[in-house]
Amino acid sequence: MKNRWPLINDNIIQEDKDALIAFLSQPNVRFTQSEKVREFEKQWSEWVGVKHSVFINSGASGNYIMASIMKEIKGKGEVIVPPVGWVSDVAPLVNLGMVPVFVDVNMESLSITVENIKNAINENTVGITLVHALGFNAVNEELIKLAKDNDLFLIEDCCESHGAKYNGRRVGSFGDVSNFSFYFGHHMTTIEGGMVCTNDDKIYDYIKMFRSHGMTREASQETKDFYSEKYPDLNPLFTFAVPGYNMRSCELNAVVGLSQIKRLDSNIERRVENLETWLNHLNSKRYFVEYNTKGNSNFSLPLILREPDKNKFEAVCDLLEKENIEFRKGTAGGGNQSRQPYLEKHKYRINGKLVNADHIHDYGLYIGNHTEVEKEQIKSLCRKLNEV
């Protein structure tokens, strides 16, 4: 049975389809990565406020590229990560022989705190993965300074937070490198797709090389010359500088992205308004509502019990199922990633107790927030939830 209130909706509208049809109707058009991809990358860089953007096949691929670059620059070591995040924030690390170190999140932004990061740093620490969960900003000046003072590689995962801001700047412009997801149902979509961003020219070369088999073809002339001079016996067109992947996207996805980005700001505005309505009408004695909403670009509507209560949480889930409202337990990525079985055969570390992450895992969920969700619909659901 179709959900009355789905978790995500299809962002594709007729305008996007018309753009695709117009592109497909051109004579001798190239479908693989070409001019439209480069145009989309340029527009995305301007929108986020970064120097460079590289279009790829998914946000998760971006996590692999960013982790691979961190390893190239810093070598193997420990990387501080949030337990509340997506699997691809952690899986690339263990696959690359690095060690994820989980520290607890705060409730206000569902992100790791400066104090918890400080307590986890040691001589083996090489980086921090900062996840902007559910549209909440996770960055601050103290965190940026902490990373810089300790010479740590700072990754920003912005896959759920397109357009979130800190001090007037969009997230994804603060770290060494950042990624975004354009999967179905996100703030905007390219059907499948993602973007990796940086302000660093060297990292930009790395991103392009890791995107396409590790080849130097798309790298800067300086990088090409370096490898040509060092390895004169190699064909410059087939010089593989890093152990790369094939994570390219194509022109069709870029055409959709170029159409979608025109509506991105208005879509975000609607999401933010819906979150405000949601938090203003929930019973604050029953549900946590004190989120740091400044500069948010809400991805979905969080619903976390204020106090542990298994019976009440089950009753909330029963109500949502009865109302035919789709939801996911544990918020982003199913809750506490350190409790997932994929880690059992790999080395990882938990620094301190994950009190908030476990509470979110056991007593939290989220429901959909998108342009089709109406304010009266939100108010009606809040009234019912407040009676549970």
Model features per residue range: what roles?
Residues 71-158, 165:
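PLP-dependent aminotransferase-like
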